[in-house]
């Protein structure tokens, strides 16, 4: 709530997507839509993931196996930051659906964020197919551990219930 410019007011929709009055009966409400305006200028805590060189290139995004020698973000020489945006919130909501992240609230949130349960199934199928592909390519007797899978860019997956309308406006339904 502290990142919101003001407390969002829900808009209630019926089965056909029509806006309902605020005093509509609960039986008539099919969807609640929250439009959340974020305060501009909120920045991430300094972190090496945001560190860039003079040309604007990320310093530590291609470390590969060298990343294993660091046990703390504080060990990196350079730190950086950037503004928090509505796109970041959408990404984090999508992360709830990933089986790569332990999310104790997924079952609950799946009932409230449109498409979150479906996204969870899609991501599980994606990872299962990826594990099978890697196992086949490597000839291993066992599939790779989830922690050994390559990075999964959740921006490539749609979630109807969370949209960034612009950098500072988030819609959740």
Residue spans of the language-model regions?
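The feature preferentially marks the first beta-strand/turn patch immediately downstream
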Residues: 1-173
